[in-house]
Design a protein with these regions (language model features):
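Extended ligand-binding clefts on enzyme/binding-domain cores
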Residues: 116
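Conserved NTP/Mg2+-binding pocket subregion across the NTase superfamily
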Residues: 1-112, 125-192
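Short, hydrophobic/amphipathic alpha-helical patches that form generic packing surfaces
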Residues: 76-87, 119-122, 199-217
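C-terminal amphipathic alpha-helical interaction region
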Residues: 168-205, 210-225
Length: 225
């Protein structure tokens, strides 16, 4: 099927298990990636925001290993936002450098966003961590979190054809989407499994936690939901 994984496997990979294997795969068009790829990106990259730091990571000096992991996860989150923007416009390509170049050339971004995206590309390709203080960690996390949520909400609005700006609107969109509901029902009825239902619950819980963050303080009302 047409997906980011298959597109990248076809055009950004070496041959696996034989010289001609990739030639046997069908051609994919980056202009025609389905909108659900944005939802998949959103659901798989939420972890980069929630699993990037130890429990007290905002309050102490991180080790070199922790800084490397944190910054690499931040880079993945930003580049996922870039990918979501490109998919919406039929501009997705397999090269990280070309994706970033397209995003910056086709999009009017503020200088701080440009710097954030270029930093993310550098970190993705050469993951050598910068030495950061706890305050700097909080500032970077805040910038990345805001960028990721903004781009993903735009992409999800495009996918679900409904404005997505908060937990309740995403929950409503999922429950009204025939494809997502059919996956939940099929798994529950015919496989006696709640795996898909639990997966959606996890996505919603992660979205709530990510949305609750602010450098000024945590929104406790969202956390309690």
């Amino acid at each position: 099927r047409s997906s980011i994984n298959n597109f990248d496997l076809k055009y950004a990979s070496d041959a696996i298990f034989g010289e001609y294997l990739l030639e046997e795969m069908p051609d994919y068009d980056g202009r025609l990636l389905p909108s659900r790829e944005v939802f998949i990106l959103f659901s798989t990259r939420l972890f980069t925001l929630l699993g990037c730091l130890p429990v007290n990571g905002f309050d102490r000096q991180l080790t070199t290993h922790e800084l490397r992991y944190f910054q690499y996860q931040m880079a993945k989150s930003v580049l996922a936002g870039v990918d979501a923007w490109l998919i919406r416009r039929g501009l997705y390509v397999s090269s990280y450098k070309r994706r970033v170049d397209l995003f910056l050339r086709k999009n009017e971004v503020k200088p701080n966003i440009k710097s954030l995206v270029l930093w993310s590309l550098s970190m993705k390709l050469n993951p050598e961590p910068d030495l950061l203080t706890p305050i700097q960690v909080s500032i970077i996390y805040d910038e990345v979190n805001n960028f990721f949520i903004r781009e993903m909400e735009s992409g999800l609005s495009w996918h679900f054809k409904k404005p997505i700006s908060e937990y309740s609107s995403l929950r409503y969109a999922i429950l009204k989407n025939p494809y997502e509901v059919s996956k939940i029902c099929y798994s529950s009825i015919f496989r006696s499994s709640s795996v898909y239902l639990n997966r959606y619950r996890l996505i919603m819980a992660q979205f709530l936690l990510a949305s609750a963050w602010s450098i000024k303080g945590i929104d406790l009302d969202l956390v309690q939901k």
